[in-house]
Amino acid sequence: MSRSQNLRHNVINQVIDDMARGHIPSPLPSQSALAEMYNISRTTVRHILSHLRECGVLTQVGNDYVIARKPDHDDGFACTTASMSEQNKVFEQAFFTMINQRQLRPGETFSELQLARAAGVSPVVVREYLLKFGRYNLIHSEKRGQWSMKQFDQSYAEQLFELREMLETHSLQHFLNLPDHDPRWLQAKTMLERHRLLRDNIGNSFRMFSQLDRDFHSLLLSAADNIFFDQSLEIISVIFHFHYQWDESDLKQRNIIAVDEHMTILSALICRSDLDATLALRNHLNSAKQSMIRSINENTRYAH
């Protein structure tokens, strides 16, 4: 089976699981929204919709897809036989999606087998991935095969942002010095357009920001061409968006502000304005830091 088929089958299994849990509304979100939710292309989304329609799970009504019946496991595919490295990538995507869609919450316990079935990967892959995150005090091993999500305090958030500021300001300087022919300049323009599209439709799509945020910071850090920076982004993204799901009281407004801040950074970057880009990035990081600290303090107050 090709890698694209493995990805498609695993995402189909994940969509089926999300439908069964009631995490996906009917009619379904737009194809572009689904692509953002699952970090896949719209071509893959169309293949998934076609499969679920043929199975009788979905019915097309005009341009919308409506859930015709509750899906079951027979509508999906057997667990992937992809290589371990491919399964790692599949689970990383699935883990991030679970956090973004509030399927994993602070204080909840879950099993390696439960996550492996949801993502369609080997439990060994899940265990290795969770052990890596365990070192950052994001999750805690309760007993063999069982884990729980942890809460962290203001000191943890400040340390996280200290690392983030060092990595991203360093990467920004590298980006500003990229040669004109580097493909990342075109990617920056595309990224700016993606932000414009989300801003124009943010009323119903503000939850889609987390994947866009991850892509934005990934592009920025890529300019450093440092594998350790890329690995740090993985941890930071999960912690940052996992924590933000706890307090949804002003999530929409926070995301609107962050989209505007990203656009200011990208515009200055594309214009090669070193000072404006640096100031915009520092402002964005400080804004995000203060927002997270407020959220932590609110959660601490309610906990008591």
UniProtKB/Swiss-Prot annotation:
Pfam families associated with the record: FCD
SMART domains listed in its UniProt record: FCD
Coiled coil region boundaries: none
Signal peptide: none
GO molecular function terms listed in the Swiss-Prot or TrEMBL record: DNA binding; DNA-binding transcription factor activity
Disruption phenotype: Cells lacking this gene fail to grow on L-galactonate as sole carbon source.
InterPro entries, alphabetized: GntR_C, TF_FadR/GntR_C, Tscrpt_reg_HTH_GntR, WH-like_DNA-bd_sf, WH_DNA-bd_sf
One annotated GO biological process: regulation of DNA-templated transcription
DNA-binding region: 31-50
Induction annotation: Highly up-regulated during growth on L-galactonate.
Protein name as it appears in the record: Probable HTH-type transcriptional regulator LgoR
Source organism of the structure: Escherichia coli (strain K12)
Key word Transcription present: yes
PANTHER family hit by this protein: HTH-TYPE TRANSCRIPTIONAL REGULATOR LGOR-RELATED (PTHR43537:SF51), TRANSCRIPTIONAL REGULATOR, GNTR FAMILY (PTHR43537)
Domain HTH gntR-type as annotated: residue spans: 1-70
Keywords: Activator, DNA-binding, Transcription, Transcription regulation
Stated role: May be a positive transcriptional regulator for lgoD and/or lgoT. Is essential for growth on L-galactonate as the sole carbon source.
Chain's gene name: lgoR
